[in-house]
């Protein structure tokens, strides 16, 4: 008999809670995503997260301890060697990643692009982090006139290749992306995802077509999601979760346009009758505010998210469990534009916790979440991680 019929796992993308013990190895000494945002805002207003025990993990400006937190609380340390989204999420579901995925804030190395040019017979232009629409405005006309390939990246571990469908036929663009995928499996490039970005239209009026194709990496082993799916449990992936695991172990995928849309979809799944896992990633914190080093926007987004939690609390049933965590840090007042190596918060709440919660021991790996989910549903336990299921008292 499952202790909880439904588990709702929410990953607040990049919401770290202070430097990890190994932060120095990553150039991240002093990083503190929520703490620095709270200082910048002169106090963060997150009353619902505070009720769950956020301030009991650590007090910050505006975020205080409460005498009787509704849920259980602690922080988790990442065991894997990366600090990117895929590494964090894969570890949450029971895998360790020894080779970090690479990000390319200065563009890709010349030797990689030389090899790609040689193997495809087409010249490469761009080679920098950019938004997909802006790069088309800048280079779309040149691409059409020369038949070259627009290669660009983002703050994530991606290599994107854009070409006009009438200049580079789709079949050829897909072949080119497969070549890029092969080349970037090399450890020194290790890119999480290669994306074909075809477009149409005229200069000044280009649009990306729905013929996008992703060449992702499958997780390097079986995750708890695979075990759930194979045992006929539901695994509902909301936001970019399905992309992060390349669809592995997912039974239903709900796309999102924003954090608020993500919260809407979470409420939708709360209204669904299912047995298994609902897994949401809220990416705006990271993509719109962390990488852009915008502490004000980040703080406002955290407060907006917090204001949606009462809808979630209201719909949770006695045999539901809500788990809230993050996948890495991205301190908006830290140097650079990259993620930061931090502890992440963990909050666990169910309406059945009539006496409220208390502190859980510090988690030595994000995989403790996967182990807890696996134990709850009686599926094969991941190789890594220690379940805290029995520490959650009703």
Curated annotation (Swiss-Prot):
GO cellular component terms attached to this protein's record: cytosol
Cofactor comment: Binds 2 manganese ions.
Cofactor(s) needed: Mn(2+)
GO annotation terms (biological process): 2-deoxyribose 1-phosphate catabolic process; 5-phosphoribose 1-diphosphate biosynthetic process; metabolic compound salvage; nucleotide metabolic process
A GO MF term: phosphopentomutase activity
Record's catalysed reaction(s): 2-deoxy-alpha-D-ribose 1-phosphate = 2-deoxy-D-ribose 5-phosphate; alpha-D-ribose 1-phosphate = D-ribose 5-phosphate
UniProt: Mn(2+) 2 binding residues: 286, 291, 339
Cellular localisation: Cytoplasm
EC number: 5.4.2.7
Pathway in which the depicted protein is active: Carbohydrate degradation; 2-deoxy-D-ribose 1-phosphate degradation; D-glyceraldehyde 3-phosphate and acetaldehyde from 2-deoxy-alpha-D-ribose 1-phosphate: step 1/2
Function: Isomerase that catalyzes the conversion of deoxy-ribose 1-phosphate (dRib-1-P) and ribose 1-phosphate (Rib-1-P) to deoxy-ribose 5-phosphate (dRib-5-P) and ribose 5-phosphate (Rib-5-P), respectively.
Stated name of the protein: Phosphopentomutase
Source organism of this protein record: Bacillus cereus (strain AH187)
